[in-house]
Each structure stands twice: as C-alpha cells, then as structure tokens.
C-alpha cells in the first residue's frame, strides 16, 4: 500500500502527535502500512496507515478497535496474562486522524513484542491457540451494540 506521498504523510503524522520521530517500516504490511516511530533512538510508538481498500469505514473500525481494547483491559483475567495494546490519541484527543485519503492511528510500542509471520514449532501453535482461546473467553460478556458509532 506504500506510495510516493508517504514522506509528507509521515510529516503530517508528526504534527498530529506532536513529536519529532524517525520512522522505519515495521513488519510485512500485508494489509496496513506500519511504522515504528523512534525518538532519540528509543522505540516509542507504532503508527499504522489503515488500508481503506480493505476496510470500507476506517473510522468505524477504529471505534470498534477502541471498544475492544477497553473491554480487554478491564478483564482482569486477560489483562493479567497478556499486554493489552494501548491506543495513543492525537494531540486533539482523536483515536486516529484522517488526512486526505489516509487514516492514521498510533499505538504505544510494546517492548519485547514480536509477530511471527510463520509458525515454526508445535509450541508456537499451542501458544497461539491458548492465547486465542483466552481472547475468546474475554469476549464472552462483550456487547455487540457497542460496536456502532453513536
């Protein structure tokens, strides 16, 4: 999804989040463009440009993501076992920013985190399955009406 306007978009991202970052691509970006933002060499945030060709309503998607993250962080059993990602609002308090045709959001960088593109052992499969089961269990009392924008 990368394009020639990426540099100017990343400059815009810095204005909305109010810091001077050095960006580097993060992951393979199968769906979204993802960047690690460092300040003074220290990883701080992860920025994502959501793919509007895949997600028809990126604002609704971000609203739903915020609802899910809030629910998971309030679930003691889940949040004691797993690090729940933290959405970082822009300077004006928005959960994401639409600029021209791109929607950007920011996450707090989770030190030591990794994303396996391919599972290479039965232990990794078992760990992923257990984590997914915990995720499903944490959603038992999640109410779908909260998915809609008010």
Set out the residue ranges of the language-model regions.
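Juxta-kinase regulatory segment immediately upstream of eukaryotic protein kinase catalytic domains
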Residues: 1-24
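Conserved ATP-binding subdomain of kinase catalytic cores across diverse folds
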Residues: 22-150
């Amino acid at each position: 999804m990368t394009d020639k306007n990426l540099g100017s978009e990343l400059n815009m991202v810095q204005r909305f989040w109010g810091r001077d970052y050095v960006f580097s691509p993060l992951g393979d970006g199968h769906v979204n463009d993802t960047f690690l933002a460092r300040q003074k060499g220290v990883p701080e945030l992860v920025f994502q440009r959501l793919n509007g060709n895949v997600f028809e309503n990126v604002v609704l998607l971000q609203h739903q993501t915020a609802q899910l993250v809030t629910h998971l962080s309030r679930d003691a059993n889940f949040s004691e076992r797993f690090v729940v990602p933290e959405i970082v609002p822009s300077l004006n308090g928005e959960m994401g920013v639409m600029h021209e045709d791109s929607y950007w959001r920011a996450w707090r960088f989770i030190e030591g985190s990794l994303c396996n593109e391919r599972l290479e052992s039965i232990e990794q499969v078992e760990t992923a399955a257990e984590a997914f089961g915990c995720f499903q269990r944490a959603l038992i009392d999640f109410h779908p009406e909260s998915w809609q924008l008010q």
